[in-house]
Amino acid sequence: MFNKILIANRGEIACRVIKTARKMGISTVAIYSDADKQALHVQMADEAVHIGPPPANQSYIVIDKVMAAIRATGAQAVHPGYGFLSENSKFAEALEAEGVIFVGPPKGAIEAMGDKITSKKIAQEANVSTVPGYMGLIEDADEAVKISNQIGYPVMIKASAGGGGKGMRIAWNDQEAREGFQSSKNEAANSFGDDRIFIEKFVTQPRHIEIQVLCDSHGNGIYLGERECSIQRRNQKVVEEAPSPFLDEATRRAMGEQAVALAKAVGYASAGTVEFIVDGQKNFYFLEMNTRLQVEHPVTELITGVDLVEQMIRVAAGEPLSITQGDVKLTGWAIENRLYAEDPYRGFLPSIGRLTRYRPPAETAAGPLLVNGKWQGDAPSGEAAVRNDTGVYEGGEISMYYDPMIAKLCTWAPTRAAAIEAMRIALDSFEVEGIGHNLPFLSAVMDHPKFISGDMTTAFIAEEYPEGFEGVNLPETDLRRVAAAAAAMHRVAEIRRTRVSGRMDNHERRVGTEWVVTLQGADFPVTIAADHDGSTVSFDDGSSMRVTSDWTPGDQLANLMVDGAPLVLKVGKISGGFRIRTRGADLKVHVRTPRQAELARLMPEKLPPDTSKMLLCPMPGLIVKVDVEVGQEVQEGQALCTIEAMKMENILRAEKKGVVAKINASAGNSLAVDDVIMEFE
């Protein structure tokens, strides 16, 4: 076994690898850029080596710099994590030449699976189900149209190299096939330096389901169930779960056996993932193989008890697998939510800045681990478990140079419904301030009827949120629970407010019992009867709720029980009440006496400023160019200007027809969020 491993990555995955290496008694080396000098993975590692400026192409993916760090520290092996150099065969080759072990598959497997045309041909030869298509090189648009007609519309036009949604077009007719071929070819050449294109049948309403495989260098291979990854936006996964709510045991076994057959066909030896698309009739088709550890690997670990990072390290050290297919048991259900630094109310634009508050929910164990083919620890209890894989800390910076993922929040429970409920509570308990984040959106997904039923495809977000995420309106049942909680909390706050220093407990000024709770445009008249154990909140329709809590004024997180069911609220003080965030909703909750509530209804509502005739900057960024001038008439959808943020260019377009009256910014200007870029007549 190795004595020292270098992790050629950063963020949460570097921290994840360090945890397992530490458990195995292996010392670790971190690498870091200027931007990551104080990063969590640097603090956790036994050693750390500086490798350059913040941009990844000047630090983390420069092979020579990583190799220099390996030589300087004497690391015997390198774990690449995911992204960066994890699927770079030249990096694996450089390590081999240096006599350093790559904790991943052989170079040949990386190359074979990294090319979509080659990988599909190998899959067909290994009797793996593939999407019908043409695997030869397509010379021009006319040939693309001919092949598309032979396959039958709709078709997917794809670049052979690369990924991430680039060089991909769906065509529903000849014209779209002709245009899509040229666009995909251009994008592929610009993005990957390789303009080879192939065409395959497009599966409508597909699910994205992947199989986790684990192979060694002794010819052994197993699969560890599947992961459902259908909830995506812009080809980026947001929510994953294991197992899939859609598959039956026969389909799972067939997919698993084909995934292992493909891995063995390329001499695979490590953890890897074979991705499939699955239609509504449970027909499945090979999509691609990721020759690395997946971001979403924790859900597999939670339902199998297998530490995938440990297995990767043991396989890399030449050990045979200690686990057989018969040892693998899928126990319970696990769900992962990816917490991103982004603003869900502004089209999920990235957010940067300092984490002024970062308090994840407490982590709890999910049951036994499978070690050397034997289960270690107690059998899973009926209680839910929480896991949070992260690479940040309170006071740390979210940088513009890297992926905006803050954490991967996972829950495990005996059933899917219990895992979802555990995730709802965990999301409500997760405190993040200082930056924009997608916690409200994740909460909304967990409460969405289609997700709850398991009836979702890769089009879920596009179909259910066609206008983008606009926040959450709680149903009346939840509003009443929040109203009862707010009334009970207000009573506690009033007792504190009216207490005189030095006065004995239970001798405070009497606090009223009748209040009106106003939230989300609704009034709830209530009466509170308090005792030593909590409060009974009665509504004017005769119903009542029992509220218990140890919340005290000033606490930013309230854990309550309302009629025996948990309710977690993020709490802030506002005049006459609270700002409460729960289940994805952001509520202003006012608690008033009946007379105050009566007068409040007569007060004119303060309207927000009218910005309908302004173009506001949606994120901190740099104006790259302005495409219009004063006096120019613009049409809906017309490009107005381009802003660069987090190394990505974002085109801002006109929301409606109008005439430009004033332009307040020019190319080269740095702007803050909501700065007025231009105004219209």
UniProtKB/Swiss-Prot annotation:
Residues bound to Mg(2+) 2: E288, N290
- Which residues does the UniProt record annotate as the domain Biotin carboxylation? 1-466
Give, as one word, the top-level EC class: ligase
The UniProt record lists the keyword Magnesium: yes
User: Which keywords annotate this record?
Assistant: ATP-binding, Biotin, Ligase, Lipid degradation, Lipid metabolism, Magnesium, Manganese, Metal-binding, Nucleotide-binding
Tell me which cofactor or cofactors this protein depends on.
Mg(2+); Mn(2+); biotin
Which chemical reaction does it catalyze? propanoyl-CoA + hydrogencarbonate + ATP = (S)-methylmalonyl-CoA + ADP + phosphate + H(+)
Q: What Pfam family does this protein match (any one)?
A: PCC_BT
**Gene3D superfamilies attached here?**
2.40.50.100, 3.30.700.30, ATP-grasp fold, B domain
Query: From its record, what is one biological process in GO terms?
Result: lipid catabolic process
For this protein, the record's SUPFAM superfamilies field holds: Glutathione synthetase ATP-binding domain-like, PreATP-grasp domain, Rudiment single hybrid motif, Single hybrid motif
Locate the residues binding Mg(2+) 1: E275, E288
Residues reported to bind biotin: F348
User: Residues bearing N6-biotinyllysine?
Assistant: K647
Q: Which SMART domains match?
A: Biotin_carb_C
Active site per UniProt? E288
GO molecular function list: ATP binding; metal ion binding; propionyl-CoA carboxylase activity
Could you state what the record's PTM comment says about this protein? Answer: The biotin cofactor is covalently attached to the C-terminal biotinyl-binding domain and is required for the catalytic activity.
- UniProt binding sites for Mn(2+) 1: E275, E288
Q: Which PANTHER family match?
A: CARBOXYLASE:PYRUVATE/ACETYL-COA/PROPIONYL-COA CARBOXYLASE, METHYLCROTONOYL-COA CARBOXYLASE SUBUNIT ALPHA, MITOCHONDRIAL-RELATED
Q: What does this protein do?
A: This is one of the 2 subunits of the biotin-dependent propionyl-CoA carboxylase (PCC), the enzyme catalyzing the carboxylation of propionyl-CoA/propanoyl-CoA to D-methylmalonyl-CoA/(S)-methylmalonyl-CoA. Within the holoenzyme, the alpha subunit catalyzes the ATP-dependent carboxylation of the biotin carried by the biotin carboxyl carrier (BCC) domain, while the beta subunit then tranfers the carboxyl group from carboxylated biotin to propionyl-CoA.
Query: What does the record say about domains?
Result: Consists of an N-terminal biotin carboxylation/carboxylase (BC) domain that catalyzes the transient carboxylation of the biotin covalently attached to the C-terminal biotinyl-binding/biotin carboxyl carrier (BCC) domain.
UniProt protein name: Propionyl-CoA carboxylase alpha chain
Q: Which organism is it from?
A: Ruegeria pomeroyi (strain ATCC 700808 / DSM 15171 / DSS-3)
Query: What would be the name of the gene that encodes this protein?
Result: pccA
